[in-house]
Amino acid sequence: MAHSVKIYDTCIGCTQCVRACPTDVLEMVPWNGCRAKQIASAPRTEDCVGCKRCESACPTDYLSVRVYLRNETTRSMGLAY
């Protein structure tokens, strides 16, 4: 089972996460929801190694891209309500 990579609509289209990913999991796709007219997408999650470099590179303080490791759930991370 691969890790789950979630891209949220707070993405500003800066490409930092795409450049930080060592396994090319992420790519930019056209999107009209931000000034950059593009958003990160994760079409190759099976290649994700769970390093979370994309999270660290994100200038929106982890609000745009999140990597959930295989055994990680929103409940185990204290995010469930």
Swiss-Prot record:
Cofactors that this protein relies on: [4Fe-4S] cluster
UniProt function note: Apoprotein for the two 4Fe-4S centers FA and FB of photosystem I (PSI); essential for photochemical activity. FB is the terminal electron acceptor of PSI, donating electrons to ferredoxin. The C-terminus interacts with PsaA/B/D and helps assemble the protein into the PSI complex. Required for binding of PsaD and PsaE to PSI. PSI is a plastocyanin-ferredoxin oxidoreductase, converting photonic excitation into a charge separation, which transfers an electron from the donor P700 chlorophyll pair to the spectroscopically characterized acceptors A0, A1, FX, FA and FB in turn.
PROSITE patterns: 4FE4S_FER_1 (PS00198), 4FE4S_FER_2 (PS51379)
Membrane topology qualifier: Peripheral membrane protein
Keyword flag Plastid: yes
Catalytic activity: reduced [plastocyanin] + hnu + oxidized [2Fe-2S]-[ferredoxin] = oxidized [plastocyanin] + reduced [2Fe-2S]-[ferredoxin]
Keywords: 4Fe-4S, Chloroplast, Electron transport, Iron, Iron-sulfur, Membrane, Metal-binding, Oxidoreductase, Photosynthesis, Photosystem I, Plastid, Repeat, Thylakoid, Transport
Subcellular location: Plastid, Chloroplast thylakoid membrane
Quaternary structure, from the entry: The eukaryotic PSI reaction center is composed of at least 11 subunits.
Organism (species): Gnetum parvifolium (Small-leaved jointfir)
Binding, [4Fe-4S] cluster 1: C11, C14, C17, C58
Binding site for [4Fe-4S] cluster 2: C21, C48, C51, C54
NCBIfam families attached to this UniProt entry: PS_I_psaC
Keyword flag Lipoprotein: no
Protein name, per record: Photosystem I iron-sulfur center
Main location: plastid
UniProt remark on cofactor binding: Binds 2 [4Fe-4S] clusters. Cluster 2 is most probably the spectroscopically characterized electron acceptor FA and cluster 1 is most probably FB.
Domain 4Fe-4S ferredoxin-type positions: 2-31, 39-68
